[in-house]
Each structure stands twice: as structure tokens, then as C-alpha cells.
Amino acid sequence: MSSVQENLITNVCQDKAAKPTNKITIVGVGQVGMACAVSVLLKELADELALVDILEDKLKGEVMDLQHGSLFLKTPTIVADKDYSVTANSRIVVVTGGVRQQEGESALNLVQRNVNVFKFIIPQVVKYSPDCIIIVVSNPVDILTYVTWKLSGLPQHRIIGSGTNLDSARFRHLISEKLGVHPSSCHGFILGEHGDTSVAVWSGVNVAGVSLQSLKPEIGTDQDSCNWKEVHKKVVDSAYEVIKLKGYTNWAIGFSVAEIVESITKNLGRVHPVSTMVKGMYGIETEVFLSLPCVLNGNGLTSVISQKLKDDEVGQLQKSSETLWGIQKDLQVL
């Protein structure tokens, strides 16, 4: 007896469905991982989304919840498993797995706990998707991006840390609040470490091409009567504040990661402040990953913009690198 499917559908082509060309995997289905997943789905960036985690019940519940919303999405396949074979042939793998930052805990204090987690995750990712681009989100992101590079054996341009892409978004939001101008029209970068030693590049802050430093040379310094320096302090403190209030951060980092993914999947060539190897730049001679303005396209992180920094900004960037190297040099990575 013929099935309902056989009676309903007449096949014209016997071939199976085409393989996905923009498969995206999210490692970790915690608050950050799911915010990344939802952001990727809503921006319609993937033709297949895979989720992987060691917590089977949580994983099954999350993927069922997303699948039940398939009618409202444009991603035809959403899958999940604790086995990394589900991630096979991913174009982009977003790593959010790891232990969560606690209230008042510096991101750098997380490092050794998360390094041990990555020793399991990264070899599995590369085994099933040797041609993928890896975006590291777990904290401390700069050190874990370095760890991912070492563990994966992949070229530098295919290892990207989410870095200060979110810090810079926070910076632009706070500037926009002070000026009453939309964040997209307030331009400025936070560079260096995603964390306490980040560098606000006040020399480059502008609105419609008008440098704020040209209007107020002391902006961002202790001599500034308008206390713009407080804006950078709020950027540094904001994650701690959100964690104190709601227990974790997730939505803004999810949006930030989806923007990075979009620049790659759509081959946009947009500039993002993301974490990359900075040895040989700005007088830094150690193998550390810090955020600089980078061009992202379909091949990954293809180039770094040589931003003209003032001497004090270079000094802060070097201090940022020294802080990371002080911890990184003693890690047991391999």
C-alpha cells in the first residue's frame, strides 16, 4: 500500500537534498550559546544549524524548542547531539562552551578552568570540520583564542576571537547616549584585551568624520572637565554590572557574534575589532591575541587595519599584551 508521502509527492529528481553550504555550529547551549544561535537564526545566516553540548537533556530541550519555531525561521535544518559528528562539515564553528564567569570574577581568573575544557572541544571540532573557521567566544576570550590556535593547528586567519567587538558596541552606545546620536553614527574602537586592560582609542572617536579630540583635545584624559573617561570605565564595568543584576550576559554578545558570522558568510569585508595574533605589531613581541581592527570576509580574518595610535594608546596596548602574556606563558596548553 502506498504511503501518504508517495501519494502526495511525485519526485522529479531522485537526488538527495543538496549539502549545506553555510552550516554553522554552536558549541555550548548555555545562555551565551543560545543567544548566538537565536541571533544567527533571526539573521538567516545558516542553511543548517548544529548545537553540541555534554548536557543531553538541556541540549534536547533547546533544539526541540527551536525546531518547534521552524515555521517562523528560514533555516531548514536544526540538529543537535552530544557527539561532535553532528557538527561535520561546518563552515563556521562558534565556541561558547566552558565554565561561567561568576559575580566579581575577572575574566582572567577563568583561564585554567576553561583551557582544560578546550582540550576536549577543539580537537573534536577540527576532526569533523577541518576546513572551518572557528570563532571563540568563551572567556577569557583572548587567551582561549590563542589556546584554540595552538590546539587546532589551523592557520591564524581561520581562528577569530570575538574580542572587543562587543566592548566597542558598548562604547558606541554610551557615546550615543551622551550625544543624542545613533550608535551607528558614533565611530570608535575599544582595542586590546576583552576585559580590564582594554584600550579606548579616543584619537579615533568621531561622529560624521568629526574627531571629538579635535573639538576637545583632553577628551578621555584626567584633565577632561566633562569626564568622558568615565565612558570607558563603564564599558569595562558593564559586564560585571549585568552579571550582578541578572547573573550572566547573553543578548548583546549573541548579537555581536551574529554580526561577525554575517561578515564571513556574506563575504562582506567589514572591519571588526576582533582578537587575532598581534606579535610584531605595535612593538609587541610575544605570541598573544588581542583585538585590532580586522577585515572579515568569506576566507576569515584576512587583514589587519594599521590604525594610527598615539604613544599613550600604544603603551596601553603593550600593557594589555603584558597582562595576558603574564598568565598565558605558564599555561599547559598542549
From Swiss-Prot:
Extract the CDD domains matched here: LDH_1
Q: What PROSITE patterns does the record point to?
A: L_LDH
Q: Where in the cell is it found?
A: Cytoplasm
Binding positions for NAD(+)? 30-58, 100, 139
GO biological process terms, alphabetically, are: lactate metabolic process; pyruvate metabolic process
Q: What is its EC number?
A: 1.1.1.27
Which residues participate in substrate binding?
A: 139, 170, 249
Q: Which Gene3D superfamilies match?
A: Lactate dehydrogenase/glycoside hydrolase, family 4, C-terminal (3.90.110.10), NAD(P)-binding Rossmann-like Domain (3.40.50.720)
Any one Gene Ontology MF annotation carried by this entry is: L-lactate dehydrogenase activity
Pfam families tied to this protein: Ldh_1_C, Ldh_1_N
Q: Which UniProt keywords are listed?
A: Cytoplasm, NAD, Oxidoreductase
List of catalytic residues: 194 (proton acceptor)
> Carries keyword Cytoplasm?
yes
Question: Does the record bear NAD in its keywords?
Answer: yes
Q: Which residues form a coiled coil?
A: none
Q: In which pathway does it act?
A: Fermentation; pyruvate fermentation to lactate; (S)-lactate from pyruvate: step 1/1
Which cellular components does GO assign to this protein? Answer: mitochondrion
Q: Which reaction equation describes what this protein catalyses?
A: (S)-lactate + NAD(+) = pyruvate + NADH + H(+)
Describe its partners and assembly state.
Homotetramer.
Similarity comment: family membership? Belongs to the LDH/MDH superfamily. LDH family.
**What is the protein's name according to its record?**
L-lactate dehydrogenase C chain
